[in-house]
């Protein structure tokens, strides 16, 4: 099988890293050889696979060694559950430098050291998603990842972020093979959430590849720094992640998305009761003015 490179984007706090590690565990359980490249300064993209608080990052190790040229691949590449290879790009100290730069440095280092030449079926990039700056767009921009999955929920800001990421994909699709492969709904138990994300997916010209229900077993597994598939393999939630990984394995639906305008997105949110229609008459009115108008 030819190497498939997939990037997972999504708003911060949406459960992107948890979802990525659980679906990758499902793919590994089915016999696939996988590498995860964490592209988030928090360096939490591999903790459930390695049972670790946080993996040493390429940027940290390079700083200790003197430069990235002084590193060996085995210094930064660790194997975890199911033989999954794990790398974290890391970033600079808060307030110093560009975190996106760490992603660029890490991917270049992995290429030069032959990490992609190993017998791999999939590479997954777990990418910080509401910052669509050059560094974080690296997996898209340099044609590293061809399949982009966006983790989303029925919350307004998660949908705004998904639409912005779709705009980024359009920008780079014309010069390469990058395509939107689907939305993964990580449920927040919002009313009509599955319908809303199906509608958003249709508007973007893609699919909701899977609806992952909310289940407390995810948190119980996380406390133990494990994926659900490893912690409780017979649970319903483990089967949900297996279903998601199987859908990704068989996915052939790769599109150049059709992002929504802000008005279209707000219309969609209003249609599903996520947002009230704007009342232009109250814009700019203070509480005192509103009270005076109400008693007039």
UniProtKB/Swiss-Prot annotation:
Its EC number(s): 1.18.6.1
Q: What name has this protein been given in UniProt?
A: Nitrogenase iron protein
Q: Which residues bind [4Fe-4S] cluster?
A: 98, 133
Q: How is it modified after translation?
A: The reversible ADP-ribosylation of Arg-101 inactivates the nitrogenase reductase and regulates nitrogenase activity.
Q: Give UniProt keywords alphabetically.
A: 4Fe-4S, ADP-ribosylation, ATP-binding, Iron, Iron-sulfur, Metal-binding, Nitrogen fixation, Nucleotide-binding, Oxidoreductase
Native organism is: Magnetococcus marinus (strain ATCC BAA-1437 / JCM 17883 / MC-1)
CDD domains, per database record? NifH
The lineage's top-level taxon is Bacteria
């Amino acid at each position: 099988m030819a190497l498939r490179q997939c990037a997972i984007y999504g708003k911060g706090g949406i459960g992107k890293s948890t979802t990525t590690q659980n679906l990758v565990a499902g793919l590994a359980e089915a016999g696939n050889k996988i590498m995860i490249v964490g592209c988030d300064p928090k360096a939490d993209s591999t903790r459930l696979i390695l049972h670790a608080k946080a993996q040493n990052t390429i940027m940290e190790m390079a700083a200790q060694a003197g430069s990235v040229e002084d590193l060996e691949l085995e210094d930064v590449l660790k194997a975890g559950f199911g033989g999954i290879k794990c790398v974290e790009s890391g970033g600079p100290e808060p307030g110093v430098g560009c975190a996106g730069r760490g992603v660029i440095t890490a991917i270049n280092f992995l290429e030069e050291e032959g990490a992609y030449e190993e017998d791999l079926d999939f590479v997954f990039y777990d990418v910080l998603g509401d910052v669509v700056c050059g560094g974080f767009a690296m997996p898209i921009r340099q044609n590293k990842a061809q399949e982009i999955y966006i983790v989303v929920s029925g919350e307004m800001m998660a949908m705004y972020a998904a639409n912005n990421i779709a705009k980024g994909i359009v920008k780079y699709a014309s010069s390469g093979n990058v395509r939107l492969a689907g939305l993964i709904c990580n449920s927040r138990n919002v009313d009509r959430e599955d319908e809303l994300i199906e509608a958003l997916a249709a508007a973007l010209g893609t699919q909701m590849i899977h609806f992952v229900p909310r289940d407390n077993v995810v948190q119980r597994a996380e406390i133990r720094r494990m994926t659900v598939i490893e912690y409780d393999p017979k649970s319903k939630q483990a089967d949900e992640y297996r279903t998601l990984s199987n859908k990704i394995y068989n996915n052939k639906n790769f599109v150049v998305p059709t992002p929504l305008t802000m008005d279209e997105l707000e219309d969609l949110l209003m249609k599903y009761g996520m947002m009230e229609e704007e009342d232009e008459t109250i814009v700019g009115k203070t509480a005192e003015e509103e009270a005076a108008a109400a008693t007039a």
